[in-house]
Amino acid sequence: MAAKDVLFGNDARTKMLRGVNVLADAVKVTLGPKGRNVVIDKSFGGPTITKDGVTVAKEIELDDKFENMGAQMVKEVASKANDEAGDGTTTATVLAQAIVNEGLKSIAAGMNPMDLKRGIDKAVIAAVAALKDASTPVTDNKAIEQVGTISANSDETVGQIIATAMDKVGAEGVITVEEGQALTDELDVVEGMQFDRGYLSPYFINKQENGTVELENPFILLVDKKVSNIRELLTTLEAVAKSGKPLLIIAEDVEGEALATLVVNNMRGIVKVAAVKAPGFGDRRKAMLQDVATLTAGTVISEEIGMELEKATLEDLGQAKRVVISKDTTIIIDGIGEEADIKARVSQIRGQIEDSSSDYDKEKLQERLAKLAGGVAVIKIGAATEIEMKEKKARVEDALHATRAAVEEGVVAGGGVALVRAAEAIKDLEGINEDQTHGINVAIRAMEAPLRQIVANCGDEASVVLNEVRNGEGNYGYNAGNSTYGDMIAMGILDPTKVTRSALQFAASVAGLMLTTEAMITDAPQDSAPAMPDMGGMGGMGGMGGMM
């Protein structure tokens, strides 16, 4: 077993703090409307330019293993916030850094780390409740547009295009972001359907850069049973191969010999094919297969109605303009189904919703209705260069996550104001001992850090602005974009409650673990093996004369 290096107490925490600060200092320069860019060197291609906190965090690895542990723990904060709400990564990082820095000062002054952590946790629970009380539900398009604008680093065109997309396909509709061909952003709304089933084998993937299967103008075979015998598919595969089009198979399952043969055919380029499981279970699966059949003008091959898979023809197959399959989802775009048939199917589902007495059934029927009637919105990003395109695409995806979060839990005043107000709401909170109360104060001070950082990135004096905001009430705050004070909601500076809440919770969770760390263990650096000694000349061989 390799030797280990161990650090204890203050030595460990000092190293860890150094790593935390390196990562957080790189991330926090991106915060706010006047946040700066970070340029990241890549081992191949040109550098990446970004204002996205989690992208910056993911790139940072430090030489010193103890410092790197601190950096990786803060990276976890950014990743968790990104996974939960899709935004708020920089805010979460700033909060974590502030809690760790303030907390370690208190520990150095002799306070109990466990009580300090309990105080921080108590403050966060109370602050989350205060945030929820201050939250305003998002009901109109204007609010959605404002949230999108803020999340895309104050890019109004992004806010507008997301609001329009949500208006077209509904808040629960499918919205995808693609790289466009023009210089300006475009929005396409196409009839489509998404369901939660991914490819059955990663060998079907044909877009390695994003790990998806993309099929253009495919035939779609719908089968209401498990397929394990390849002989059942041979007729269909031969007909599709002759047509030169790709094939998507949606069945209860495709396994064994059948799946292996499909993979081999796909890899050899004989026929471009992919297979996914049908969505749902039991009767719901049958109904959803029928929905796909209506959308794509296909027929569900079902033995219940006397159809055999071996006898399926091209006429039984559905068709669509495009299919995109990821690890977990399948999107069928622009099926060739007749509009009248789709409308009839939609009316039928609406009737079932009205007749149903079960809330669960109603919810599932509503989902089917959204898939059939909603369609898919595609936002095509326009930019002058590839570097700008990548940076902008990441921002739009962030903004899309944020607007969904806003619709889910509502919005609060942006610009760090909501956290300042939450801190004021809990200022009289006390712990069961002095150290816990100090932990509460650590959290309260840390909740001012995002506002301070936004102001610092603008080049203004953070303490002066914070004092002015504290003296106000409600949504009164500082608009860092134009250096004015006023009602943040009225000025359109909003943050989704879910983003602010999850940033605070994840920051406190990971920071609490760091504060209660007493030892750190890592592999000791290994000395390179010494070179073999020089053997020199083989002396002493003289005096061997006279040998015949």
Swiss-Prot record:
One of its GO terms (molecular function) is isomerase activity. Its EC number is 5.6.1.7. GO terms for cellular component: cytoplasm. Its main location: cytoplasm. It is an enzyme of class 5 (isomerase). It is found in: Cytoplasm. Pfam families: Cpn60_TCP1. CDD domains: GroEL (cd03344). GO terms for biological process: protein refolding. Belongs to the chaperonin (HSP60) family. Forms a cylinder of 14 subunits composed of two heptameric rings stacked back-to-back. Interacts with the co-chaperonin GroES. Together with its co-chaperonin GroES, plays an essential role in assisting protein folding. The GroEL-GroES system forms a nano-cage that allows encapsulation of the non-native substrate proteins and provides a physical environment optimized to promote and accelerate protein folding. This is Chaperonin GroEL. It comes from Colwellia psychrerythraea (strain 34H / ATCC BAA-681).
